């Protein structure tokens, strides 16, 4: 399996945002943009892997600016990282007003994809050839994001496992919620995983 460059699978998708894509507020529906992001992530990952890929996680989707009907939405996607069977695809989304030529950055995100073999099980993907400092930085950034995510997940699991209702109720005092049930000593038993 020969290593592949970032450019080998880099994909740019541009689509006109039509009225049927609008939400109740008249802007392009975020769900449509997410669907397009998933499609372009699949195209990039499958081209690099040379096989069918599935979406495993989507990280950091933030809608920075609204997309208007009539604008051209462009999704620029490339492989940022490869593991054994997984790939991280970085996607930058911009929209362009065709009348004014104004381009605005609307989204970016990272899709983790896993390559599947004929048997439906994860299969090895080609190594990624890093041809410049930007590609190297993106690869390293992906490793750092994975590490931070793993640490955050472990911390949240520990917090969940150590739930102490009396202590954790303090957190709720300034929140927008109401507790409308009787709290008793046996309540913590409801939260144990055993």
Regions found by a protein language model. Give the residues of each.
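Post-transcriptional modification and biogenesis factors for structured RNAs
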Residues: 3
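HotDog/MaoC-like acyl-thioester-processing domains
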Residues: 6-11, 69, 80-173, 177-193
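Active-site-flanking beta-strand signature of metal-NTP-handling nucleotidyl enzymes
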Residues: 12-16
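Surface-exposed, Lys/Arg-rich phosphate-binding patches that contact polyanionic backbones
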Residues: 21
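Anion-recognition interface
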Residues: 26
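Active-site helix/loop of acyl-thioester processing domains in fatty-acid/polyketide metabolism
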Residues: 32-50, 194
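Conserved interaction-surface patches within small, structured recognition/assembly domains
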Residues: 54-64, 72-80, 95
């Amino acid at each position: 399996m020969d290593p592949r460059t970032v450019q080998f699978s880099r994909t740019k998708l541009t689509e006109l945002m039509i009225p049927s894509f609008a939400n109740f507020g008249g802007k392009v529906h975020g769900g449509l943009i997410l669907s397009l992001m998933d499609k372009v992530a699949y195209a990039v990952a499958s081209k690099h892997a040379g096989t069918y890929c599935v979406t495993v996680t989507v990280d950091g989707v933030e809608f920075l600016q609204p997309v208007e009907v009539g604008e051209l939405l462009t999704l620029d996607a490339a492989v940022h990282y490869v593991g054994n069977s997984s790939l991280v695809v970085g996607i930058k989304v911009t929209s362009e007003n065709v009348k004014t030529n104004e381009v605005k950055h609307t989204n970016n995100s990272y899709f983790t994809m896993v390559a599947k073999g004929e048997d439906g099980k994860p299969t090895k993907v080609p190594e990624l050839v890093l041809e410049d400092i930007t590609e190297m930085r993106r690869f390293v950034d992906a490793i750092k994001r994975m590490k931070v995510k793993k640490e955050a997940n472990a911390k949240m699991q520990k917090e969940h496992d150590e739930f102490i209702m009396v202590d954790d109720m303090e957190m709720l005092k300034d929140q927008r919620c109401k507790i409308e049930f009787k709290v008793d000593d046996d309540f913590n038993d409801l939260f144990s995983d055993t």
